[in-house]
Amino acid sequence: MTIEATIVDIAKAAKKAALAMATCPTDKKNQALLALADRLHKDAALIQAENKKDLEAAKATGLSSAMIDRLTVSDAVIASMADGLREVAALPDPVGAKSATWRRPNGLEVARMRIPLGVIGIIYESRPNVTVDAAGLCLKAGNTVILRGGSEALHSNRALAATISASLAESGLPETAVQVVPVADREAVTHLLAQEEYIDLIIPRGGEGLIRFVVQHSSIPVLKHYKGVCHVYVDQDADMEMARAICFNAKVQRPGVCNAMETLLVHRDAAQRFLPDMARQFADAGVALRGCAATRALLPGIETAEEADWYAEYLDLILAVKVVDSMDAAISHIATYGSSHTEVIVTNSYDRAMRFLAAVDSSVVLVNASTRFNDGGQLGLGAEIGISTSKLHAFGPMGLEELTTTKFIVLGNGQIRE
């Protein structure tokens, strides 16, 4: 069978299974999630044996230590995947919830009701844990899912797929509700992106190159964020101690994630009070600064920021720093160089905070809090499948509700239109 035929068969099976999943009772979905959590522990040795094949191949091809770390399915990773499934099982089921109801003058009762999106395709790199995490979220929201992981994790993902299928069968759900693309060839991705007849949404998770490839080649709607160029703006009347704590956390806690700060903007009237102490704190943590001319006048030992630095998602202990003349200049900088991901203002002015919230066009905008809070769990959404900087169909962290849509339901008693 050709790769194209394999993908078409997978997509058709997912579409068929979506009909059953759309009306699957909550308790049955939860049962499947809990069964999968238990089976992950039972199948741990088999999963790790397959993972070892991927790790050996990765080392032989010179994959970086960071990539190998993401690829490794340790006991802790298995426990984390199982715990995540149990957490999803405990979350409220969005399917069937009515968000608004009203009665028309002719007696028709109209409501909006949440329903699954249908078939979701997820294309991702390296991390085998995404296979289980994504499957759990999609199932709880009543969707079916086609998972295409990176070729470097093929053995691991096949093993996880077998565990998922066994759990679905045990719980009486369609085994094709979760399918892993079984071939490593990149041609499979191209064919997957052409299945608009069967797949309702594509979610890519990975580097900017992968995401741009998916967007350019997909005939199916895509939810994505290319990168996280996140900003913190320190206003003229900010509490300096608070600002330093927020900036340090936003850059240093986990510099390799998409909600880490990449550019620091400081009001000119606060720069002298803020930057020297902040720079010393960053230096102690190994953060390399790249600054504009005004920044370098205060911090002469740092590198000069080039134009490319303002666009950069470093994912490392590197930070671009710019002194701005006003909050409006900070907002303009974010509009020019930002990626619609996460932005922060540190200020004691309520009016400026509210204006910043209204003017900045990003998926999460915070006042006096770290960029690191752009996360489904931290915002009270529960688990998330990713962060979207697309405004259609979701903007920001995508939890269970964002994996559903709404339809209108109308109850009548014989009304006809005159």
Swiss-Prot record:
Pfam families: Aldedh. It catalyses: L-glutamate 5-semialdehyde + phosphate + NADP(+) = L-glutamyl 5-phosphate + NADPH + H(+). Pathway: Amino-acid biosynthesis; L-proline biosynthesis; L-glutamate 5-semialdehyde from L-glutamate: step 2/2. Keywords: Amino-acid biosynthesis, Cytoplasm, NADP, Oxidoreductase, Proline biosynthesis. It is an enzyme of class 1 (oxidoreductase). It is found in: Cytoplasm. Catalyzes the NADPH-dependent reduction of L-glutamate 5-phosphate into L-glutamate 5-semialdehyde and phosphate. The product spontaneously undergoes cyclization to form 1-pyrroline-5-carboxylate. Belongs to the gamma-glutamyl phosphate reductase family. This is Gamma-glutamyl phosphate reductase. It comes from Desulfosudis oleivorans (strain DSM 6200 / JCM 39069 / Hxd3). The lineage of its organism: Bacteria, Pseudomonadati, Thermodesulfobacteriota, Desulfobacteria, Desulfobacterales. The gene is proA.
